[in-house]
Amino acid sequence: MTARRWTVGVDFGGTNVKAGLVSPAGRVVATRLLSSKAVSRPARFVEGLGRAVEDLARSVGSRPGELRGVCVGAPGSVDVERGVVHGLVNVPGWHRVPLRRLLERRLGCRCAVDNDANLFALGEFTFGAGRGAQCLVCLTLGTGLGGGLIVGGVLHRGVSGAAGEPGHMVIDPDGPRCGCGN
């Protein structure tokens, strides 16, 4: 099997960054785990993820430039067309970061960046419990809260890219602050 058919999927969470080497059949065959704190700044993230992707590619006798591509799911606002992360609620220092460009330069292969909950919804729709469904709502609950929405077999991002994202409100004005600042 040629390396150009393998991809790497990355889940950038508020606690951990998980990178998985994905076979052409959609199976995760190898993973690497990084602490989000260790790669909290964009330059550290690109370098740390670069090393993880190199290691994953080597595990199938390849190099990153020979992979089909790398896709990062980020827990925040993402301009999918330009590959720019506008902000991450639980990870400071991420404002208007051209992550796709930085990763493509580092890895030498095609890269994509999207909201993590949108990618979760697409994954379930394509390979998981949502396979065959025309409408699907996926909610992520971890360090943060997110949502992805598929209607009529199409991922919906909405005008501002936040379709499917659940809102939240202050319950106790004197309570602890949320990662969003409220």
Task: Kindly give the residue locations of the regions a language model identified.
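Glycine-rich phosphate-binding loop and adjoining helix at the ATP-binding site
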Residues: 36-38, 42-50, 54, 58, ...
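Glycine/Thr-rich phosphate-binding loops of Rossmann-like dinucleotide-binding domains
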Residues: 18, 80-82, 147
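Conserved catalytic-loop position in the HRD/HxD motif
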Residues: 11
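Short coil turn/linker residues within repeat-based beta-strand modules
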Residues: 26-28, 82
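Assembly/interface hotspot detector across virion components, adhesins/toxins, and nucleic-acid enzymes
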Residues: 8, 76-78, 150
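Glycine/GP-enriched mid-protein hinge/lid loop-to-helix segment characteristic of carbohydrate kinases
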Residues: 2-6, 20-23, 30-33, 40-45, ...
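Conserved Rossmann-like nucleotide-cofactor binding loop
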Residues: 15
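A short alpha-helix-loop-beta-strand transition element characteristic
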Residues: 64-65, 158
